[in-house]
Amino acid sequence: MKLTRRVTIWILTAVGAVALGACGAKSPPDSSAPTTLTMRAAAPSLTIGVPLTMIANRTDKAHGITVDLQAFGTSSTISIDAVLAGQAMFGSVGTLTALQAIRQGADLRIIAAVVNNVQMMVIRNDVGQRLGVSPTAPIAERVRALKGLTVATGAVGSTHYQILRSYLRQYGLNPDTDVRLIGIAEPSALVSGIEQRRFDAIAYASPLVEHAIARGAGQVWISGPRGDIPGSDNIKTGLIVVRAETIEKNRDQVEALRAALTDALRAVQSERVATGQKLHGMYFANLEGGVWETAWDATTTAYPANLAFTRQAYDYWITNDPKGAESYRNVDYAQITYDRAQSQ
């Protein structure tokens, strides 16, 4: 029996809401049809490049499942809430947001890490000129030059928000007093804000901030993907989480998703030209080709070798939590991390 599928991904990009899908009338289900599972995520960016590649290449179907990826906004909290409420089986979320939810009692498990650091900071052209610091100056000079500026990033408390705070502290700035940080829950507001001169700089996942470059509003100031900040290149900024009971009751589906993500990760690493072209066409077509290629090429080392959420990355994030590592004294890395996703 032939099954026609309906898969709809709602995407909120920097230019508005776009619905992408393959639609058709559904036939009655049969036992050989792939199981449809929902994954919630923030708006498409290279933070979720591996899940996007899984959808683009349909590696999920190769492992007996069909993933309905619903992606919008900038807050991982919404995705976590959907997982906890049973509205989604999987959440593709920011690492710190996931860990904070677990610390607060959310019965979640980390089954995969899908990206390292893809945060980019773009500074307004006129601000860069006024500072008198070159965008190729030593990173310490570029970070310290942010003193007194207004910088917008992801929602307050989000992974992007905390990455930025850690950069500032690393180079001697107080993120609460030396820089005016603004958390934004709507990704398109980052680009429009820098265009309208409300922000001096914006920091978020590539390639969303590159829209500001494409529109002539700014230039790259700090690049996580190219390793500008020492020690931040392997910190696992994006995770896949599930409820603990999902592992107990649906381990086969968890394993199927991990296998599909592994295939997608291999494509990201070894088939970069073809994968980049496909992602550009499906999710980032409104980004001019040259700008997209620059953003994609910069992520060569931004994706991990495997899906492990390392103990090293865990230690990094709990140390950079605003409440400190001590607030995780009742959290056990080995318990919250799926056994096959653990590594030093």
Task: Give the role of each language-model region.
Residues 30-174, 182, 200, 204-206, ...:
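Short, glycine-/small- and polar/acidic-enriched structural segments
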Residues 1-11:
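Bacterial N-terminal signal peptides that target proteins for export
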Residues 318-344:
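Conserved C-terminal helix/tail region of periplasmic/extracytoplasmic solute-binding proteins
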Residues 62, 129-136, 143, 226-233, ...:
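Short, solvent-exposed loop/beta-turn-alpha elements that line the ligand-binding surface or hinge
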Residues 24-26:
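Bacterial signal peptide processing site
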